[in-house]
């Protein structure tokens, strides 16, 4: 899938959920809310190309954590929001992958976690959360957000 087609599709979607005068934080929250409420989770996907993953999600309306991450990254990129992709470190050989983002609402000075993948039964909201919040959730849920912290900027403490 060529990036121009995917970008055009994202731009059309963004016209419905953000405005030019919105602050970066509001754009992040609007994108988060849209992705969480307009797509459904399916079990697996091809994880070789995030642009293709975003396109598949926008076309089919469903995907796994990689597709959620990919469509979110696409929307953030099109809004000019600095973001960094994060990949979970596997806790054991057959552990699953997981993908989410670190996002900055101040032009790249500080970052917060953003994970649009829905959670079954717990309703946790991972929109602009700190390392402490995400780590507490991860520790209580079998290391679901373990990551090599040396690869990513630390979030503010509060």
Predicted feature locations:
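Secondary-structure boundary elements
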Residues: 2-57
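Flexible, glycine- and charge-enriched loops at secondary-structure boundaries
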Residues: 3, 21, 62-65, 127
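Active-site nucleophilic cysteine motif
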Residues: 24-31, 61-76
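Repeated polar recognition positions within modular binding domains
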Residues: 38, 42-45, 59, 96, ...
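Catalytic cysteine-centered active-site loop
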Residues: 42-55, 62, 80-95
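Short, well-ordered strand-loop elements centered on a beta-strand within folded domains, enriched
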Residues: 53-56, 60, 109-115
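Hydrophobic/aromatic-rich core segments of domains that either
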Residues: 67-135
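Low-complexity, Gly/Ser/Thr/Pro-rich intrinsically disordered linker/tail segments
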Residues: 123-158
């Amino acid at each position: 899938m060529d990036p121009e087609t995917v970008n055009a599709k994202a731009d059309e979607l963004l016209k419905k959920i953000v405005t030019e005068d919105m602050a970066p934080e509001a754009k992040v929250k609007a994108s988060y809310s849209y992705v969480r409420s307009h797509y459904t989770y399916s079990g697996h996907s091809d994880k070789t190309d995030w642009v293709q993953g975003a396109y598949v999600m926008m076309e089919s309306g469903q995907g796994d954590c990689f597709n959620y991450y990919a469509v979110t990254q696409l929307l953030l990129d099109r809004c000019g929001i600095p973001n960094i992709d994060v990949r979970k470190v596997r806790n054991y050989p057959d552990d699953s992958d997981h993908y989410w983002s670190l996002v900055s609402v101040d032009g790249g000075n500080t970052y917060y976690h953003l994970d649009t993948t829905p959670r079954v039964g717990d309703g946790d909201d991972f929109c602009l959360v700190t390392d402490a919040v995400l780590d507490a959730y991860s520790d209580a849920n079998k290391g679901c957000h373990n990551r090599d912290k040396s690869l990513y900027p630390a979030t503010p403490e509060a």
